[in-house]
């Protein structure tokens, strides 16, 4: 989303079950579950693209009744500043989703910089093995493809740990299966990973 959105703008059926929790993102999820412990009524959420950060943010806002600013670096800084102040006055949480938290992100507006310096920042990490496994299962499952545990285990131990790599693998293995009329299994996964050039040799099992 490229604007400050109201909860009514989002699908009403998104739930906690839509966001996969693993060790790589559990700390961020816990933080969002305990708004009462926040030092101010705002938090910044960062993480890689395709990490589910916008989904997690929407679920949080739908549950909490708060406000979301997504892609914050692209938004009007005055609007973010006023949203931050409004959150403190109303005591309704504000979640700011951004690529980088300060000091890497340095707004030009001094008043906003001062507010963000007092705002906690949480981060979704790159996917761990458990999350990669479940992402492959879910993404291919959404296309009507049931995957076996050994297929996913083969991919997990070889693919680069990034959400972009996982999404690209799913797209390519699905396309390859259709083009070659091949079953989605380890032989096809091996071919696709080699073609992608994303095999992480350091993660291969001995």
PLM features: what roles do these ranges have?
Residues 102-117:
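Short regulatory helix/loop adjacent to the ATP-binding pocket of P-loop NTPases
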Residues 4-26:
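Dynamic helix-loop-helix/coil hinge segments at AAA+ ATPase domain boundaries and subdomain interfaces
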């Amino acid at each position: 989303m490229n604007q400050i959105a109201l909860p009514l703008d989002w699908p009403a059926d998104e739930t906690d079950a839509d966001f996969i929790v693993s060790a790589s993102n559990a700390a961020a999820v816990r933080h969002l579950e305990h708004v009462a412990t926040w030092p101010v009524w705002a938090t910044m959420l960062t993480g890689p693209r395709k990490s589910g950060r916008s989904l997690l943010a929407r679920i949080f806002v739908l549950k909490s009744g708060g406000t979301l600013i997504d892609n914050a670096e692209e938004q009007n800084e005055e609007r973010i500043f006023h949203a931050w102040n409004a959150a403190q006055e109303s005591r309704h949480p504000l979640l700011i989703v951004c690529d980088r938290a300060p000091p890497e992100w340095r707004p030009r507006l001094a008043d906003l910089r001062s507010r963000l310096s007092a705002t906690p920042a949480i981060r979704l990490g790159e996917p761990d093995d458990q999350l990669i496994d479940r992402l492959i299962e879910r993404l291919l499952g959404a296309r009507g493809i049931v995957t076996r545990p050994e297929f996913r285990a083969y991919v997990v131990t070889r693919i680069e740990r990034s959400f972009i790599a996982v999404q690209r693998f799913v797209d390519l293995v699905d396309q390859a299966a259709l083009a070659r009329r091949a079953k989605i299994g380890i032989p096809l996964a091996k071919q696709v990973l080699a073609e992608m050039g994303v095999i992480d040799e350091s993660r291969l099992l001995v």
